[in-house]
Amino acid sequence: MEKTIAAISTAPAPGGIGMVRISGKGAFAVADRVFRGVSGRAVSQMKGYTAQLGGAFTPAGERLDDVVALVYRSPKSYTGEDVVELSCHGGLYVTKRLLQLVLDAGASPAGPGEFTRRAFLNGKVDLAQAEAVMGVIGASGEQALKAAQAGSSGVLSKKIQAIKAQLLVQASHLAAWADFPEEDVPAVEEQGLLSAIRAGEESLARLLAGFERGRMYREGLSTVIAGRPNAGKSTLMNLLSGCERSIVTQYAGTTRDVVEETVLLAGVPLRLADTAGIRDTDDPVESIGVQAAKRRLESAQLVLAVFDSSQSLEKEDWELMDTLQGVPAVAIVNKTDLPTQMDVGEIQRRFEKTVFLSASTGEGLEELEQELSEILDTKEFHPEEGVLFTQRQRADAQMALDSLREGEQAMALGMTLDAVTVCVEDALNALSALTGEQVSEEIVDRVFEEFCVGK
């Protein structure tokens, strides 16, 4: 980490401010070659956590833009190194020009996630906290943001360390008993060992149980809006998305391609897919859309099944109800602003949740959100308590849990404590891998290659 790195840390789009971040031993020297403050003080003379207004200049003395320089001195910075942040007006061109001036002054381009990688290598964050940073950046809802913030502040890491602390006490007793059998070493208290193993199992099982729910808030649910033609699927899509995403006409078969949009409903990002009305058709183009709708239904995590209450149930409605048996689905009895002609009781018998709604007026939308909250069990999610964020974390936690269960089974079978020791040590190694205390460089590379440049 000898080289000084730099990158644009704001979004690659026009905005109020553009910012170039510089980190490394030469950060102040690089900034001094680019920045001139109105006070006459060089960046290298500024105290940590101070800012100064000035300008960015080319080597020929040409002024690029007004710039604010913000200084962080090692080790009290995000990366643990000397850091300078140069903020200019947020045009794409001027921000790129500012970065080029910094690179010409001696900095090297930062790779994806290299600032956070340096924070990890310098002990400012562990690997689980680093992964949560990407969760903060990518959060699409309140619960996902809370979970990511808890992770980046170390809540998950503290839970893992608490499990490790209990197991380390037992591991040290086991090691002393195994290494010094002829010394006056107290015998291993097996009940205490078993209690520690079971406590670790319980904590890990809770974390693993929350993984899928946490992923639901982070990644959203693949949600299909299905129904026969003219049931009001596209009108519902437009209502939920808050804009005219789908074409709406009185003619059946208007929607042919799958129209997609992500919306936040009941606190959960729903990746909506408005599909073609499912029916038998001789139109070859519409038929392709119908087949696409059926494929989407097969892989959907949630289905919003739309029925037109102003008409009697038809063949396509019955077929849809049969198709959705055992599938997480909410029945939406649509067009409640019109006289009802449908046998609503039949739908209520077929679906666990039924919502009466008018997609054209919006009446019933709150009820839909309430029913989704119940079916998705959103009240049972407590992100502030710590959540496993990635498949890597999940795999390490599962490995630790499996090892502890094997240790408990070894004790139940009356196997020697040597066998139990191996299981406890395997669990500790898996937990250390989760937080990054014992992890290969290949794993570290894989984690940070998912990051954006500038973070």
Features from the language model and the residues they span:
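Conserved beta-strand segments of alpha/beta enzyme cores
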Residues: S108, P269-R271, K353
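A glycine-rich (often HGG/GG-containing) alpha/beta subdomain
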Residues: M1-K146, A150, G154, V330
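Short beta->alpha junction loops/turns
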Residues: S23-G24, G91, A252, S309-S310, ...
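Glycine-rich, N-terminal phosphate-binding loop of Rossmann-like dinucleotide-binding domains
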Residues: C88-G90, L240, T275, F307-S310
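C-terminal-of-GTPase-core extension/linker across diverse P-loop GTPases
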Residues: E2-I8, P12, E142-L264, T281-D283, ...
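Switch I (G2) and immediately adjacent beta-strands of P-loop GTPase domains
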Residues: Q52-R73, G253-T281, S299-L302, V306
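Short glycine-/polar-rich loops that comprise or flank the Walker A/P-loop
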Residues: G15-I17, Y49-Q52, S299-V303, G326-A329, ...
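Inter-motif core of Ras-like GTPase G domains
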Residues: E286-S310
